[in-house]
């Protein structure tokens, strides 16, 4: 259904566009086309005048004037060129005549001179002496020097000669440095040495900047407890002369925290042989000094952890720490602390057996027996050679009629020895022969402890003997009869 129309007219919002244009610009009118064309022509002429265009009459006058001026200039140039030609012609004829006369006179004079000198000898040309500047001569000798490097055959100074000259110069510098080394070592002896194994009078030869930098690092390490280590300290293991550099940092005054971090750093980055040097020169000395200087003769916790970390390389620990500690005469306190570290850390069986064989051959001492007991208590499957060494070690303390075993027969044996003997009987009673068992029972009877001796005897009797196998018989078992 359509919408109903409204009678009310809507009010417009604004006037129509046509009314707005009329109000702003006036009434719109039609423009005549002729007037529009005239206006365009006028505008075009005005634009031409502004751009500098001229009409045809003016341009013809300008071209005529330019042509007249050009003709006048060409006429003047032509007249001048003709005058020059006439002058040159007169000059050349005069000069040719004069030159002919001069040549005749010179020939006559030269002939007279030759006739005058003919009786006396040949004619010699006089040499001209030229003075050379000193700077030019020095520069010439620098590039073309006459010496051993100068190739006299070819008369040149080539690249090979320069290379040989530089090689000889380098060799001379090396010889000079070798001559100066004794003097440098004498100057460095005043810096002292650490008790880490440097011989008396031995010093380090390092650049002054390096010594200054690592002296500053050493002053930082005195009070270092946590955080990151200086980068200069971390790069020491990668240096070839790390022992000289670490000596400058004064390891005796490192804090215990630094000893632990340094042990981890050096043992993990150096080879076993180089790690042995670090453990022996620094860690062992700090271990002994700390126990000796402490009031209760205990070891600092961080140094204890450092000793534990040094077992990361067992061969370096045994050769650089344990063996020197025993050989230099450690006390039972030091052996007990070091042994507790050894008891807590797993050691490869081969390293353990080799260390045990080495300790069994040393003269008797209670600290050595402490380490023997700890290694036996690890329950490793020892080689028969090491087991035999253990048997001979305990057998040598029995009393012999001829007294061939010396002081070992009369020595008062400590309790730790009996404990080590009991440990061996418990762990390896099935790895000994019957003859060895009899000798050990005799030792227990003569030198046995009142409480520990019966236990050792019971363990030895409970074990089974190791059967001795002849190598030839073992090979016979593997033979096959092919007939």
Swiss-Prot record:
Primary gene name: ENP1
Region (Disordered): 1-21, 33-55, 67-123, 171-200
Biased composition (Acidic residues): 96-123, 174-183
Molecular-function GO term, any one: snoRNA binding
Record carries keyword Cytoplasm: yes
Keyword Nucleus found: yes
Protein name, UniProt field: Essential nuclear protein 1
Physiological role: Required for normal export of the pre-40S particles from the nucleus to the cytoplasm. Its subcellular location and association with pre-40S subunit shifts from mixed cytoplasm/nucleus to all nuclear in RPS19 disruptions, suggesting it acts after the ribosomal protein.
InterPro entries given in the database record: Bystin (IPR007955)
Assigned protein family: Belongs to the bystin family.
Extra information: Present with 21600 molecules/cell in log phase SD medium.
Phosphoserine: modified positions: 172, 190, 404
GO terms of biological process kind: endonucleolytic cleavage in ITS1 to separate SSU-rRNA from 5.8S rRNA and LSU-rRNA from tricistronic rRNA transcript (SSU-rRNA, 5.8S rRNA, LSU-rRNA); maturation of SSU-rRNA; poly(A)+ mRNA export from nucleus; rRNA processing
């Amino acid at each position: 259904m359509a919408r109903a129309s409204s009678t009310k007219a809507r009010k417009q919002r604004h006037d129509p566009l046509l009314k707005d244009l009329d109000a702003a610009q006036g009434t719109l009118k039609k423009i005549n086309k002729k007037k529009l064309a005239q206006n365009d022509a006028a505008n075009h002429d005005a634009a031409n005048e502004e751009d500098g265009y001229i009409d045809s009459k003016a341009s013809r006058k300008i071209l005529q004037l330019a042509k007249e001026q050009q003709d006048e200039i060409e006429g003047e140039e032509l007249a001048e060129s003709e005058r020059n030609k006439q002058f040159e012609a007169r000059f050349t004829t005069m000069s040719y005549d004069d030159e002919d006369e001069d040549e005749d006179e010179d020939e006559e004079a030269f002939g007279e001179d030759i006739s005058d000198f003919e009786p006396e000898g040949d004619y010699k040309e006089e040499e001209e002496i030229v003075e050379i500047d000193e700077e030019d001569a020095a520069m010439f000798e620098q590039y073309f020097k006459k010496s051993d490097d100068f190739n006299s055959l070819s008369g040149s100074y080539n690249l090979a000669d320069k290379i040989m000259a530089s090689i000889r110069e380098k060799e001379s510098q090396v010889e000079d440095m070798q001559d100066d080394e004794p003097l440098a070592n004498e100057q460095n002896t005043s810096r002292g040495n650490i008790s880490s194994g440097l011989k008396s009078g031995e010093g380090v030869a390092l650049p002054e900047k390096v010594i200054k930098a690592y002296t500053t690092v050493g002053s930082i390490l005195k009070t270092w407890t946590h955080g990151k280590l200086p980068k200069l300290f971390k790069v020491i293991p990668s240096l070839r002369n790390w022992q000289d550099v670490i000596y400058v940092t004064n390891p005796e005054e490192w804090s215990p925290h630094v000893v632990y971090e340094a042990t981890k750093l050096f043992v993990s980055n150096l080879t076993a042989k180089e790690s042995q040097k670090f453990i022996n020169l620094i860690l062992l000395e700090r271990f002994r000094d700390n126990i000796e200087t402490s009031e209760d003769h205990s070891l600092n916790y961080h140094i204890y952890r450092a000793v534990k970390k040094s077992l990361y390389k067992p061969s370096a620990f045994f050769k650089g720490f344990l063996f020197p500690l025993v050989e230099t005469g450690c006390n039972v306190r030091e052996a007990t602390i070091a042994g507790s570290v050894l008891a807590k850390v797993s050691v490869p069986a081969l390293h353990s057996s080799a260390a045990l064989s080495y300790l069994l051959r040393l003269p008797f001492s209670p600290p050595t027996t402490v380490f023997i007991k700890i290694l036996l208590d690890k329950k490793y499957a020892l080689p028969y050679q090491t087991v035999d060494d253990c048997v001979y070690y305990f057998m040598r303390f029995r009393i012999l009629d001829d007294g061939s075993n010396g002081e070992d027969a009369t020595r008062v044996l400590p309790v730790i020895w009996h404990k080590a003997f009991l440990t061996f009987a418990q762990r390896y009673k099935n790895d000994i022969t019957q003859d060895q068992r009899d000798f050990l029972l005799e030792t227990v009877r003569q030198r046995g402890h009142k409480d520990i001796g019966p236990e050792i005897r019971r363990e030895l009797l409970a074990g089974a003997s190791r059967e001795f196998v002849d190598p030839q018989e073992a090979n016979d078992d593997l033979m096959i009869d092919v007939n």
